[in-house]
């Protein structure tokens, strides 16, 4: 979709949908929202809906980076401590590596 051919109200509506969709445990939508609407929010000349789009883009960026931090922390903890958790670590694993930890 070419955003230049879409009305400003439709841009705002689409940006809002991507922002709200990110709350359904889909942080990739926030990343798409950031890349797709960054130009509309911060570079193009000002228009009425731009301030709302800017807010959605900023909040999408914050949400996405919080997801990255939480997911990176969980992956690091799981990789380091999984063998110590015994049966629980094995239960949470999709594949169980061979050998000793």
UniProtKB/Swiss-Prot annotation:
It comes from the Eukaryota. The keyword Ubl conjugation does not apply. The keyword Magnesium does not apply. Residues 18-36 dip into the membrane without crossing it. GO terms for biological process: amyloid precursor protein metabolic process; amyloid-beta formation; Notch receptor processing; Notch signaling pathway. The functional gamma-secretase complex is composed of at least four polypeptides: a presenilin homodimer (PSEN1 or PSEN2), nicastrin (NCSTN), APH1 (APH1A or APH1B) and PSENEN. It comes from Bos taurus. This is Gamma-secretase subunit PEN-2.
């Amino acid at each position: 979709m070419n955003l230049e051919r879409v009305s400003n109200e439709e841009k705002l509506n689409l940006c809002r949908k991507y922002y709200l969709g990110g709350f359904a445990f889909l942080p990739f939508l926030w990343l798409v929202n950031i890349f797709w609407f960054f130009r509309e929010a911060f570079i193009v000349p000002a228009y009425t809906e731009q301030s709302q789009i800017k807010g959605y883009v900023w909040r999408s960026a914050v949400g996405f980076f919080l997801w990255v931090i939480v997911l990176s922390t969980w992956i690091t903890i799981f990789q380091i401590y999984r063998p110590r958790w015994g049966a629980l670590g094995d239960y949470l694993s999709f594949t169980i590596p061979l050998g000793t930890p």
